[in-house]
A protein has these predicted regions:
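Surface loop/turn motifs at the tips and blade-to-blade linkers of beta-strand repeat domains
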Residues: 4-8, 50-53
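Conserved beta-strand position repeated across blades of beta-propeller domains
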Residues: 15-17, 60
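Conserved hydrophobic/aromatic "anchor" residues
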Residues: 1, 19, 37, 45-47, ...
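Gly/Ser/Thr/Pro-enriched helix-cap/hinge segments flanking short amphipathic alpha-helices
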Residues: 45-60, 64-182
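Loop/turn residues immediately N-terminal
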Residues: 32-35
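Acidic/hydrophobic-patterned starts of short beta strands in beta-sheet-rich repeat architectures
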Residues: 21-30, 67-75
Length: 182
């Protein structure tokens, strides 16, 4: 365990995702060396051996099998965009018993993809916030579905969506382990 994260090699991409749905955002980095760092929830991170020994140059994330856990599509190149002999790989997250809430947002007055929407969930853990983005790192487009890990919590007190148009949607007493299409 370490408060400091030692990212080796030449990092090209990096984003925050909650891979274990414990409510704390983890870090994934790709480049000449890839790494995943699990957020311990106490301002420290632990390195996770998650992939094979071939270092990803690129990746995209999303819930590919709709189980509520973030999966990874790993791309292999020879620095940036030069092709390599290594096939790209999909890693399906095997998950755990932690709970989640997934959101697919579609703008009606706001832009169709809800880019710029600000989402808050409130519960016994406090507040979690996400923003719908069109891109998060160098050369990638991740799934726009927003997934909130809530650990062992079985209920979300409130869900607040602040749409780019200025409209606000609030839902109370939201059940976990579901995907809402709003």
């Amino acid at each position: 365990e370490s408060t400091l994260i030692n990212i080796e090699g030449l990092p090209i991409q990096g984003i925050w995702e909650d891979f274990d749905n414990d409510g704390f955002l983890d870090i994934i980095v790709a480049g000449s060396k890839h790494s995943i760092w699990r957020n311990n929830g106490d301002k420290t991170f632990t390195y996770v051996e998650a992939f094979d020994n071939n270092d990803m140059e690129s990746f995209a994330t999303g819930d590919l099998n709709s189980d509520g856990f973030i999966d990874v599509m790993g791309g292999y190149a020879n620095i940036y965009t030069s092709p390599s002999d290594i096939d790209d790989v999909v890693w399906l997250n095997q998950g755990n018993s932690n709970n989640y809430l997934a959101l697919n947002l579609t703008g009606v007055i706001s832009n169709r993809n809800a880019i710029g929407a600000w989402i808050e969930i409130h519960g016994d853990w406090g507040v979690q916030i996400r923003e719908v983005r069109a891109g998060e790192s160098y050369g990638i487009m991740n799934d726009m579905k927003q997934i909130f890990g809530v650990g062992s919590s079985t209920n979300i007190d409130s869900l607040v969506i602040k749409w780019p148009s200025g409209i606000q949607t609030t839902l109370l007493d939201v059940e976990v382990n579901q995907t809402l299409n709003l």
